[in-house]
Swiss-Prot record:
SUPFAM superfamilies with a match to the protein in the record: DsbB-like
A biological process term (GO) from this entry: protein folding
Record's function text: Required for disulfide bond formation in some periplasmic proteins. Acts by oxidizing the DsbA protein.
Name the record gives this protein: Disulfide bond formation protein B
Residues exposed to the Periplasmic side: 30-47, 89-145
Species per Swiss-Prot/TrEMBL record: Saccharophagus degradans (strain 2-40 / ATCC 43961 / DSM 17024)
Disulfide bonds: C39-C42, C104-C131
Keywords from the named record: Cell inner membrane, Cell membrane, Chaperone, Disulfide bond, Electron transport, Membrane, Oxidoreductase, Redox-active center, Transmembrane, Transmembrane helix, Transport
Length: 166
């Protein structure tokens, strides 16, 4: 039996980047073609997916030595963990009983125009009634559920990238 060689650090970083691009393209397809408008938590999840992707792209371009790999791995993992937390909150909101769903709030542009930055960020991460709607599901998981699964995968690969020797 022949043992195949694992992808290099740079190749794996590019695979992570490509995966993040694919996730964002899927989100844009759902928004623009299917007409599924993103709620504030959806947009927040996109931001953290973009964060993981950009960190991985920079890591691929830089192709650092051991310490740099740990730094990039930690940064990508941090972005992934925060994104997974936002996804988990989103799934939690979607599974609340109807009488406990928070009221619908303002849209994202209004939040950042009308409120100080920290207050707008608190509102953004809290989510609102718009975030509780399940607009589509596949194999029993809503879009935020699948995003959570994607974040778990990105976190696992990012941790491995930070810990790998070669």
């Amino acid at each position: 039996m022949k043992i195949t060689k694992l992808p290099s650090y740079r190749q794996t970083a590019l695979i992570i980047f490509a995966g993040c691009v694919g996730l964002i393209l899927a989100a844009l397809y759902m928004q623009e073609v299917l007409g599924l408008h993103p709620c504030p938590l959806c947009i927040t999840q996109r931001i953290f997916i973009i964060g993981v992707g950009l960190i991985s792209l920079i890591a691929a371009i830089h192709n650092p030595a051991a310490l740099g790999r740990k730094v990039y791995g930690c940064l990508a993992t941090l972005s992934g963990v925060i994104g997974a937390g936002v996804s988990a909150r989103h799934v939690w909101l979607q599974n609340l009983p109807e009488d406990q769903v928070p009221a619908c709030g303002p849209d994202l542009a209004y939040m950042f125009d009308a409120f100080p930055l920290l207050d707008a960020l608190k509102l953004l991460f809290a989510g609102d009634g718009n975030c509780a709607d399940v607009v589509a599901s596949f194999l029993g998981l809503s879009i935020p559920g699948w995003t959570f699964v994607a974040f778990v995968g990105l976190i696992a690969i990012s941790v491995w990238q930070g810990l790998r020797k070669a």
